[in-house]
């Protein structure tokens, strides 16, 4: 009986530790997200509606990609709010049917038009948010290969099985940010004239 009690206590401690870790992780993400002002709400909403994408998801992608810094540029040369590489942006311009101007990748409207349009193209291709996000970061060719090789289930993708560390972490971050934003913003973003700090929104939603 003593052995069973000890095992029960150890098991209970492990479960408690796991729950605590999950809550702590969510809390850290929520806190970090709440400290960030969300910018360009009107523009994000405009192009999200144009391409039938959840604006909360678009904001989550922008948050992870550039932290709402329109001048952001990665070491690989990705630019703007949605961190578009030249090749990706050029392809997206063809997809959405506009002329391509590489010098405009830091233009807010142009970048969002291409970025949200490209995500919509990926979502329509895979019919799955997680796969579309994985392709946005890791490339369509790689995601198709993982599906073909049976690494990723097209109908029920498991993020933890994504082979690329960067892509796996990227999808995880966007999904986590989306969950946090969805909690506070519900189904739409406030306009640019509204105070958008999540600490204020959390007060309004939960009081």
Placement of each model-derived feature along the sequence:
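N-terminal Lys/Arg-rich, disordered targeting/topogenic segments
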Residues: 1-6
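Hydrophobic membrane-insertion alpha-helices, especially the h-region
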Residues: 9-27
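Catalytic glycan-binding domains that act on GlcNAc-containing polysaccharides
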Residues: 23-207
């Amino acid at each position: 009986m003593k052995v069973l009690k000890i095992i029960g206590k150890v098991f209970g401690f492990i479960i408690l530790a796991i729950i605590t870790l999950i809550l702590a992780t969510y809390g850290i993400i929520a806190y970090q997200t709440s400290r960030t002002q969300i910018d360009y709400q009107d523009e994000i909403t405009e192009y999200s509606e144009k391409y039938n994408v959840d604006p909360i998801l678009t904001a989550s992608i922008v948050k992870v990609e550039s932290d709402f810094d329109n001048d952001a540029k990665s070491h690989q040369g990705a630019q703007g709010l949605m961190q578009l590489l030249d090749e990706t942006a050029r392809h997206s311009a063809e997809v959405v049917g506009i002329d391509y101007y590489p010098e405009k990748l830091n233009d807010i409207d142009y970048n969002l038009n291409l970025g949200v349009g490209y995500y919509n193209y990926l979502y329509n291709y895979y019919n799955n948010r997680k796969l579309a996000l994985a392709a946005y970061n890791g490339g369509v060719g790689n995601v198709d290969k993982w599906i073909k090789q049976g690494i990723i289930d097209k109908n029920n993708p498991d993020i933890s099985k994504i082979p690329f560390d960067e892509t796996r972490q990227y999808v995880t971050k966007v999904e986590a940010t989306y969950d946090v934003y969805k909690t506070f913003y519900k189904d739409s973003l406030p306009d640019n004239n509204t105070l958008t700090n999540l600490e204020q929104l959390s007060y309004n939603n939960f009081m």
